[in-house]
Amino acid sequence: MDIEFEATFIDIDLDIFRKKLKSVGAELINPERLMKRVVFDPPQDMAGAWLRVRDEGDKITMSIKQVTGNKIDEQKETELIIDNFEEGVKFLESIGGKKKSYQENKRESWLYREAKIEIDTWPGLESFVEVEAKSEKMVKSISEDLGLDFSKGLFGSVEIVYKIKLGIPPKVINDETPEITFENPPLQYK
């Protein structure tokens, strides 16, 4: 798997951030759209790993992701483009993937200096920003260009944002929440 150099930034004023994107010449490549995914545990034990089929609105992907820590170089991913969401789900089931959850989010995608800038909205959460580039150095530089403080970046999956914002333990969001949708969003954890 390749390292996925990505940082997540929360507590962002999106009006100001979109103006900044436009002022630096970023290109809106996809307006906000609904994305859906089915997430699986791999058939063999891989710490911090999951399989996913995701309908991104303009393409369908199947991937394996693994997060082994909370540093930018501890996120790995291999992703394929496929042509059928349901067949992708069947494929992962047929190789022994254990279905964990169905999840939705909304995403707006920008391109800046060969980096992907995503504005994500997940059920129950305020929108946040992800910056993904080819290296840690590039993520830092682009974050700086966009007025984002790299030292406040989060590294990992959305489970971290659910923990910070709603107090939901990662194990609960990852292993005990079979559906994350806008009709049935996670609530503050008690």
Which role fits each region the language model picked out?
Residues 10, 134-136:
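Short amphipathic alpha-helical "recognition" segments used for binding
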Residues 120-126:
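A contiguous pocket-lining binding segment that forms or flanks enzyme active sites
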Residues 1-116, 149-190:
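N-terminal strand-loop-strand beta-hairpin
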Residues 68-71, 125, 137:
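Short, surface-exposed beta-strand-loop junctions and turns on beta-sheet-rich folds
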Residues 136, 140-149:
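A hydrophobic, small-residue-rich beta->alpha segment in the mid-to-C-terminal subdomain
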Residues 65-67, 122, 134:
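Surface loops and adjacent helix of pleckstrin homology
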